[in-house]
């Protein structure tokens, strides 16, 4: 008799996706991040749902409702700490997942990659509107600064900014709609993640060598389910260590003060996972130019398949490209550091150099390295 999981219409989909899925035999721990991201999303939706039961999206009560959750709700402090630090874990996994895709040439699965970039943008939007909800000083001023960037769009910019605000500044209407967006977006992310998987399963997973692995596949279960379980346990361990021992380490002290439109914090900065893009935005001394650079810093991922010049897919056997990749990684860490510093010398010039290097590496140096490696691999006799 054929197993129910192979015949039942619903179980059949799960079976083809997570049980009998043929997977390359050599995929490393870098391929764990997909399942870790799925887990992060589930944690965020669950903790977020329980937080939403006690939160009020009104400028007068939002801040005190968050304090109420932490003081009076059973394990409310834990829910809040898991949700806030879960976002940090989510972005850590996202950045590592994207980095893996760049290193091993996974972007050549164009549909999967493009959906992935859309997912990244959607998660960033969700995190931004979510950061506004506690209605602390940094929440309010972060929302003011970032939504103000819309006003740089010629002709319709100011109208668009006021339309998003629901008034002439960030206020009650803005907070209410941001809560609505923050509630709906994770479900859109879930749907997009399913589409992401759908396109991935059309081609099958890439692998570290970048060579077609069809001749050597193994079933996903039990081999990769057990491997993913180890990754999930480590993720849980790090998240719990963060949420229980230093829950405010990655937050901003200014957010412990209620929002005050009459008092601007000395350094307005977003959460750590946006700092690299914020540094690129600030490094251009022109508002519109900065916004375009900010958009380009993420949108550049969409053209990576067009910039691939190497004959080999993966960087595993391409030392020049590897070197440039790790320089790019160091550059992004530098940008993250600069984004959290005040706008003064020497941080301004370091940020500008790091921003130029970021685009130079992706648009010029890495494609040239691919061509050079092709030339070096050609027989010379």
From Swiss-Prot:
Residues reported to bind heme b b566: 97, 196
UniProt GO cellular component terms: mitochondrial inner membrane; respiratory chain complex III
Entry's cofactor comment: Binds 2 heme b groups non-covalently.
Recorded topology in the membrane: Multi-pass membrane protein
Transmembrane stretches, start-end: 33-53, 77-98, 113-133, 178-198, 226-246, 288-308, 320-340, 347-367
Required cofactor names: heme b
Keywords: Electron transport, Heme, Iron, Membrane, Metal-binding, Mitochondrion, Mitochondrion inner membrane, Respiratory chain, Transmembrane, Transmembrane helix, Transport, Ubiquinone
Binding residues annotated for heme b b562, in chain numbering: 83, 182
Molecular function GO terms recorded: metal ion binding; ubiquinol-cytochrome-c reductase activity
Binding site for a ubiquinone: 201
Name of one Pfam family that matches: Cytochrom_B_C
Family membership: Belongs to the cytochrome b family.
Physiological role: Component of the ubiquinol-cytochrome c reductase complex (complex III or cytochrome b-c1 complex) that is part of the mitochondrial respiratory chain. The b-c1 complex mediates electron transfer from ubiquinol to cytochrome c. Contributes to the generation of a proton gradient across the mitochondrial membrane that is then used for ATP synthesis.
Name of the protein: Cytochrome b
């Amino acid at each position: 008799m054929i197993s129910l999981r192979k015949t039942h219409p619903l179980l059949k989909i799960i079976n083809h996706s997570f049980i009998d899925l043929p997977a390359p035999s050599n995929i490393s721990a870098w391929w764990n991040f997909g399942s870790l991201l799925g887990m992060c999303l589930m944690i965020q939706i669950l903790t977020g749902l329980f937080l939403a039961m006690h939160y009020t999206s009104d400028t007068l009560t939002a801040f005190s409702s968050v304090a109420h959750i932490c003081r009076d709700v059973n394990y409310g402090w834990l829910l809040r700490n898991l949700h806030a630090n879960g976002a940090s874990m989510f972005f850590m996994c996202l950045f590592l997942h994207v980095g893996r895709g760049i290193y091993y040439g996974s972007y050549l699965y164009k549909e999967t990659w493009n959906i992935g970039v859309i997912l990244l943008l959607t998660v960033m939007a969700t995190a931004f509107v979510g950061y506004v909800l506690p209605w602390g000083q940094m929440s309010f001023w972060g929302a003011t600064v970032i939504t103000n960037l819309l006003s740089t769009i010629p002709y319709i910019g100011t109208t668009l900014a006021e339309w998003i605000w629901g008034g002439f500044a960030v206020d009650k209407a803005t907070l209410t709609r941001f809560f609505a967006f923050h509630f709906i977006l994770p479900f859109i992310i879930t749907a997009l993640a399913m589409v992401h998987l759908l396109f991935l399963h059309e081609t099958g997973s890439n692998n570290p060598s970048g060579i077609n692995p069809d001749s050597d596949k193994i079933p996903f279960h039990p081999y990769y389910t057990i491997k993913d379980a180890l990754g999930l346990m480590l993720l849980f361990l790090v998240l719990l260590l963060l949420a229980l021992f230093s829950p405010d380490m990655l937050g901003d002290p200014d957010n412990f003060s209620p929002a005050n439109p009459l008092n601007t914090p000395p350094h307005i900065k977003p959460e750590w996972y946006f700092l690299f893009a914020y540094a690129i935005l600030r490094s251009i001394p022109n508002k519109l130019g900065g916004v375009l650079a900010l958009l380009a810093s993420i949108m550049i991922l969409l053209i990576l398949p067009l910039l691939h010049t190497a004959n080999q897919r993966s960087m595993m056997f391409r030392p020049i490209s590897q070197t440039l990749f790790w320089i790019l990684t160091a550059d992004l860490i530098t940008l993250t550091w600069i984004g959290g510093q005040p706008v003064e010398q020497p941080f301004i010039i370091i940020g500008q150099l790091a921003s130029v290097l970021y685009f130079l590496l992706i648009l010029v140096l890495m494609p040239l390295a691919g061509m050079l490696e092709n030339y070096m691999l050609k027989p010379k006799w």
